[in-house]
Amino acid sequence: YGWQATQESGSGRRGFVKGLKQLFGSKVAIFTLDPESARRRGVQSDFAVKIPYNQVMVEDIAALADELNLHATAVESSYLIVNKYGRDWLSVLLHQDPKDIKDFADQIGAHPESISALHRKLKRLEKFDFLQEKVIEDAVFKIMEFIDKGIHIVLEFGQQSSFLCYMLVANILTRRIHDLYVMKSERYLAAGRTQDKPKQLIITIEEAHKFLNPMAARQTIFGTIAREMRKYFVSLLIIDQRPSSIDDEIMSQVGTRITSLLSDEKDIAAVLTGVSNASWLRSVLASLDSKQQALLMGHAVPMPVVIRTRDYDGVFYTAMGHVEGEELAQKAHANIADLFGDR
């Protein structure tokens, strides 16, 4: 989405399409977890994201329990490490020699087998280059700086594309952004000054059921945001191919839904939760063109309506104001003339 993406052509072959940065220029910033991959692909990133170990909370690890195959007792043991070492808990744990785990567990009053399992599973995090002991610049403060300027941000993962990486980073960054938004919102509500009002923020997540299934929704920051219903000026745009896996309470909070063709009965039922005329809409959903139509319903429209999606091609680029080649040169010349006059 940031710089360039692949897209299937009508013949089934894959071609390249422009990303948001190419179309909207300075209105979009690309933050990357993998600057080397970005450079190899010619991506013009704006910031390389590094996350210090002391920003990883136990809650972030708890949300990864399924991906890490972590037992609940191992997660609970994390709090015993936090009680002794505070924010340095993860760094201290990862630096333990496996031979010393029993002594370490005795020091904090934990079961050796639980600490051993926790240590073994969390060692996987060391393969992520963006996790470091110390960082020069705080990625979340940088994100907030861009947001305050009204600049949209695409977080690019590069070759760090595992679900474990995606869920870890999404949880950490979103949790901290939400914390800052709560502070900004409370300051605005207390003083009532227009200049303190936070910019409305929409956070987009793919594979949303990973964060918002019944178990994860109680543990991740995304469940909190969904239940708050924009209370702190933060909303979620959730994208998923398996809506039936998303917690029912969360689905009931989704105000506007854009739904393409669905064939699974459970997914159809989930999307139509709380919607009037569900039986009629069920037949509409089942008859949509798989690539060109979507059903739009909810707060954004007075009644459900089927829309035809636009092709993402050169015609669309032009409609968005994108120009290149000779036309770009002419536009640049015209802008210079407007600024300095013809010479």
Model-derived segments and their meaning:
Residues Q7-G12, A170, T204, A226, ...:
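RecA-like P-loop NTPase motor core of helicase/translocase proteins
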Residues Q55-E59, V75-S78, H178-V182, A226-K231, ...:
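Glycine-rich loops and low-complexity Gly/Arg-rich segments
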Residues A226-R308:
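Conserved ATP-driven motor cores of ASCE-family P-loop NTPases powering translocation/secretion/packaging/pilus
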Residues K50, N54, Q132, L212, ...:
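Generic, ordered loop/turn and secondary-structure boundary motif
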Residues R39, L164, G255, V305, ...:
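Intrinsically disordered, low-complexity acidic/polar segments
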Residues Y1-T224, S290-A300:
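P-loop NTPase motor domains
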